[in-house]
A protein has these predicted regions:
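Acyl-donor (CoA/ACP) binding surface of acyl/acetyltransferases
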Residues: 1-41, 67, 71-193
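Soluble sensory domains of the PAS superfamily and closely related sensory modules
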Residues: 61-63
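Conserved GNAT-fold acetyl-CoA-binding loop/helix
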Residues: 38-59
Length: 193
């Protein structure tokens, strides 16, 4: 079952990032990375063609209250997003959780920023929101995302085919991470590995 989420008043700091709610003033930064070919495509959406397209999606981030802006501490620039999306992972109904989805500006790839952000959100979801689990996935062609998932401690749950915003069904893998405080018996946790 999808746990309730509202990140409007949440602020999480890591060594190099601030995770916070999106603001209308983030539009230029958002468009700057979302318009780059290959960035959105790794997450299943087409790169943005206009500032207006980015504005519509930014408005949905703000009203949806489930997506963090990733702000680079060094200069205050928004360089990515991390959302807590609803997903039917096929886990028992009594368990509460969400799926982590993320995108990072190509200029910041290869610096270990996304594992840093994901770890902070895992801690927040398990310690503050008391989620039972989180899921996270990647498309087969996205090795960078696979490495983030693996570094973050997720375990393979199942192979999936996802209908993307690009109108394409993409094969991939879905992983799960159980809250270690609530679920200590690993033998009873549904996983493939």
């Amino acid at each position: 079952m999808n746990a309730p989420v509202d990140v409007t008043a949440v602020r999480i700091e890591t060594e190099r990032l601030i995770l916070r709610a999106w603001r209308e003033t983030d539009l230029a930064d958002f468009y700057e990375y979302a318009r780059v070919e290959g960035v959105g495509e790794m997450a299943g959406w087409n790169h943005h063609q206009s500032m207006e397209e980015s504005r519509r999606i930014l408005d949905s981030f703000i009203s949806g209250k489930k997506t963090f802006a990733l702000e680079w501490k060094e200069n205050g620039k928004v360089i990515g997003s991390l959302g807590l999306e609803p997903r039917d992972a096929g886990l028992p109904e009594e368990l509460q959780g969400r799926e982590i989805g993320y995108v990072l500006s190509r200029d910041y790839w290869g610096r270990g920023l996304m594992p840093e952000a994901v770890k902070a959100v895992i801690d927040y979801c398990f310690q503050e929101l008391s989620f039972d689990y989180l899921t996270c996935g990647h498309f087969d062609y996205n090795d960078r995302s696979r490495r983030v998932v693996e570094k973050s401690g997720f375990r393979l749950l199942k192979r999936v085919v996802t209908s993307t915003a690009r109108g394409v069904d993409e094969p991939g893998k879905l992983y799960v991470l159980y809250n270690p405080v609530k679920h200590t018996d690993k033998e009873k946790q549904p996983c493939l590995n």
